[in-house]
């Protein structure tokens, strides 16, 4: 089957959101992308719709690939194929074309993340030349009963972004980088406790996402991240906490 690729910028946001949702039906982690969620994703992750592609077969959308770009690096932010179009080499064809286009743009690097239980996805990306770099981990904690007397101080998210750029690991994943953190806005909130910092999603919601945790270089190894987490869980009781699978495994001790 031959697939034609068209710029995602040729389609409306509602069309893209609907295609994203349908393209991930039945996947290891199905997703429901609303228009608002897609717009947030585009802004926060630097997704370029002119470089992103919609797969077309028989004049009908068959899948989507979102490409994020910063400097000389591009990232496959998401790729999904409609259930009726799977197992027909669409993924392989599309990836070869996306890599070719990245070379034409003179990108120096192309990166992506894939859930390790998605064995078909892992095989696809390795087949077209990607190499495993490291493992990313995520967690979930429901209604922890924690008491802490420590006081968190709220700070501007932009300040945290600058600190992450300066003090964070030099090879942080795309979604943890200072550049990404800079794009978060209220109702997300950033806090500090001495030399420890964090960014969370709207704390008024039942489910809260921890988007960033940082301890300044000079204070690492003193257990500040645990003190910070305890203060955070104590401040917002009766919540369901989510750590998305974007944190390098070497940072797992924080959680």
List each language-model region with its residue ranges.
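Conserved active-site alpha-helix within GNAT-family acetyltransferase domains
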Residues: 88, 92, 104, 116-134, ...
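Active-site acidic-Proline motif in GNAT/NAT acetyltransferases
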Residues: 69, 82-84, 88, 116-117, ...
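Active-site rim helix/loop that mediates acceptor-substrate recognition in acyltransferases
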Residues: 29-66, 166-192
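Conserved acetyl-CoA-binding loop-helix of GNAT-fold acetyltransferases
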Residues: 81, 87-100, 123-127, 221-234
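Conserved beta-strand in the GNAT
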Residues: 54, 60-68, 75-80, 192-203, ...
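Amide-forming acyltransferase catalytic core, primarily the GNAT-like/NAT-type
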Residues: 128-202
């Amino acid at each position: 089957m031959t697939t034609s690729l068209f710029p995602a910028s040729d389609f409306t946001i509602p069309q893209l959101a609907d295609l994203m949702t349908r393209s991930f039906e039945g996947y290891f982690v199905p997703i429901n992308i609303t228009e608002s969620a897609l717009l947030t994703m585009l802004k926060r992750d630097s997704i370029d719709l002119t470089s992103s592609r919609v797969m077309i077969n028989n004049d009908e959308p068959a899948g989507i690939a979102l490409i994020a770009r910063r400097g000389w690096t591009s990232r496959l932010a998401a790729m999904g194929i409609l259930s009726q179009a799977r197992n027909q080499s669409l993924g392989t064809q599309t990836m070869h074309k996306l890599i070719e286009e990245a070379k034409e743009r003179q990108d120096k690097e192309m990166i992506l993340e894939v859930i390790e239980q998605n064995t078909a996805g892992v095989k696809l990306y390795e087949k077209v030349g990607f190499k495993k770099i490291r493992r990313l981990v995520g967690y979930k904690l429901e209604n922890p009963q924690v008491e802490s007397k420590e006081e968190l101080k709220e700070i501007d998210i932009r300040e945290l972004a600058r600190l992450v750029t300066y003090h964070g690991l030099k090879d942080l994943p795309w979604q943890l980088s200072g550049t990404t953190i800079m794009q978060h806005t209220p109702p997300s909130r950033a806090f500090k406790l001495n030399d420890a910092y964090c960014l969370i999603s709207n704390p008024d919601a039942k489910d809260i996402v921890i988007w960033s945790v940082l301890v300044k270089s000079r204070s690492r190894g003193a257990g500040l991240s645990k003190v910070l987490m305890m203060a955070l869980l104590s401040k917002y009781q009766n919540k369901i906490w989510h750590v998305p699978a974007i944190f390098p495994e070497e940072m797992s001790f924080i959680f």
